[in-house]
Amino acid sequence: MTLLDLSVGQVAMVKEVFAGSYGQGLVTRLEAMGIFSDKPIQVLRKAVLGGPVHVRVGSTTELAMRRSEAQLVSVHFDEPE
């Protein structure tokens, strides 16, 4: 499941960030913004007509990212123990 598959308001945990055709530079940039494994991420808004996805990383950082980048962020739901 990817970040783009989440509905608005859903919270998941980042599983992995894939480089895709962007290369390792994208992975490094997203990690610098706080998107890395086992970090909670929430979809706040999805723009219409293929626009960006607005997300919250952790409890404070908000950013907008291209849909093509959001597809490269693999997520999972935190399983209660």
What do these predicted ranges mean?
Residues 18, 45-50:
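Short, charged beta-turn/beta-strand-edge "cap" motif at the junction between a beta-strand
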Residues 10-12, 49, 54-81:
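C-terminal structural segments of small proteins and small subunits
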Residues 2-3:
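Tandem CBS (Bateman) regulatory domains
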Residues 23-29:
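Short alpha-helix capping/helix-loop boundary micro-motifs
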